[in-house]
Amino acid sequence: MSQVQSGILPEHCRAAIWIEANVKGEVDALRAASKTFADKLATFEAKFPDAHLGAVVAFGNNIWRALSGGVGAEELKDFPGYGKGLAPTTQFDVLIHILSLRHDVNFSVAQAAMEAFGDCIEVKEEIHGFRWVEERDLSGFVDGTENPAGEETRREVAVIKDGVDAGGSYVFVQRWEHNLKQLNRMSVHDQEMMIGRTKEANEEIDGDERPETSHLTRVDLKEDGKGLKIVRQSLPYGTASGTHGLYFCAYCARLHNIEQQLLSMFGDTDGKRDAMLRFTKPVTGGYYFAPSLDKLMAL
């Protein structure tokens, strides 16, 4: 069985760092840097076992085709953006995702990543996420209630089982900026109708009682009676005095599942848009492919 990169399956991490970058040099330098970083990561994982450290190196479409010779990741493409600009694209070449129970360890690993990749990449965005009270989003609603639980279930959803991409996963990242003043002008009832759950108790509102535009309705999708599940590794980010929101991060064995949720949220299926756009907006978006650790080391 191909070994999955260690940042895909962990649950309940308390902190994360996401780094998106473009490639500056030759892909051979990127190959070598990826292996160097994987070796450094293994050293940190052994040094801090209680941190439950994990990380992922993933690649955008053009770079993956160059690295793999055009083999595998058939669903991978540049993030096109959705909703006629509501969900903009900021597609980059490389994504590095680091997560654990300790921000200090994450930061050390991020420094090691910068040393490993050096001048072969140009960092375009670096975001530090944190677990908030009771695993809630900054809106006050619990985030990720329907996230698959347990390693076996999460593996079933997030990891490609067999074939040339076995052990790999498709990744989507999207940074959302919240306007909490706008949210707080709404009554709690209106907020709950917008999300599709009660705010304090985190109870699902019955489908016939919540609007078609509620967030829950837009993303709780089924095909042939089976839910289009994803594994979320999202966290709040930002500063109290400035920009803040949710860094959305999803892994899935099928890019299809992620894309169908986005099409539904941004009105590209039936013209109805996710009501949470009333107080928050996405400002970035990128699709990536995370190969198995075995394949990463053999690039």
From Swiss-Prot:
Subcellular location: Cytoplasm
Cofactor note: Binds 1 heme b (iron(II)-protoporphyrin IX) group non-covalently.
Superkingdom of origin organism: Bacteria
Keywords: Cytoplasm, Heme, Iron, Metal-binding, Oxidoreductase, Peroxidase
Signal peptide: none
GO molecular function, one term: heme binding
Required cofactor(s): heme b
Residue sites binding heme per the record: 215
Cellular-component GO terms for this entry: cytosol
Enzyme Commission no: 1.11.1.-
One Pfam family in the UniProt entry: Dyp_perox_N
Chain's role: Has both general peroxidase activity and dye-decolorizing activity. Can catalyze the oxidation of 2,2'-azino-bis(3-ethylbenzothiazoline-6-sulphonic acid) (ABTS), and the phenolic compounds guaiacol and catechol. Also decolorizes the anthraquinone dye reactive blue 19 (RB19).
Similarity comment: Belongs to the DyP-type peroxidase family.
Name of the molecule in the record: Dye-decolorizing peroxidase YfeX
